[in-house]
A protein has these predicted regions:
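C-terminal segments of enzyme domains that contribute to small-molecule binding surfaces
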Residues: 2-16, 20, 71-92, 100, ...
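Left-handed beta-helix
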Residues: 15, 20-21, 26-27, 32-33, ...
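A short beta-loop-beta micro-motif enriched in histidine and acidic residues
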Residues: 49
Length: 179
């Protein structure tokens, strides 16, 4: 795995967190307990902080970055990801906040200042435009992403289950099993 410092700040990994050897995790990045970072992911906390909560996963070929502080936005946009979050393959996250139990579908893009409340699904290929707030309990789809419908109770239960399944899978990889 490539855990690299930036300006003398090295990423921190919580207990049981796992980073694939092909991934790059750079700078001010904190991974919570049992979080996982999958092949060919880039997480770059150079000009702001990135926090990824417990049991959350960032899947293959995704990019997570931040925005620097600037006039009119003294804090910039960190990227903050809650617990039990599933970030699908080839997702781009930039300077956004994602609360707990969220699924961001394959190929989606989430931009600066976006807030995704807990218990949300973002459909594959969606574009969440800057500053948008996605309310809890709904599926959002499209470009730009729009509220489509309420999540079913089964869908709400599926998100933390997927996060737990990825914890089990990352443990198998970490322990040398590839089946």
């Amino acid at each position: 795995m490539a855990i690299r410092p930036y300006l003398d700040v090295t990423p921190t990994l919580g207990p049981g967190a796992w980073v694939d050897e092909t991934a790059q995790v750079i700078g001010r990045v904190e991974l919570g307990a049992d979080a996982s970072v999958w092949p060919f992911v880039l997480i770059r906390g150079d000009v702001n902080v990135i926090r990824i909560g417990a049991r959350s996963n960032v899947q293959d070929a995704s990019i997570v970055h931040v925005s620097r502080p600037h006039a009119g936005n003294e804090a910039g946009w960190p990227t903050l990801i809650g617990e039990d979050v599933v970030i699908g393959h080839k997702v781009a996250l930039h300077g956004c906040t994602i609360h707990d139990r969220v699924l961001v579908g394959i190929g989606s893009i989430v931009l600066d200042g976006v807030v995704i409340e807990s218990d949300v699904m973002v459909g594959a290929g969606s574009l969440v435009t800057p500053g948008k707030r996605l309310e809890s309990g709904y599926l959002y789809v499209g470009s730009p992403a729009r509220r489509s419908r309420e999540l079913t109770s089964e869908e709400r239960a599926r998100i933390p289950k997927m996060a737990r399944d990825y914890v089990t899978l990352q443990r198998a990889y970490r322990d040398g099993g590839h089946s």
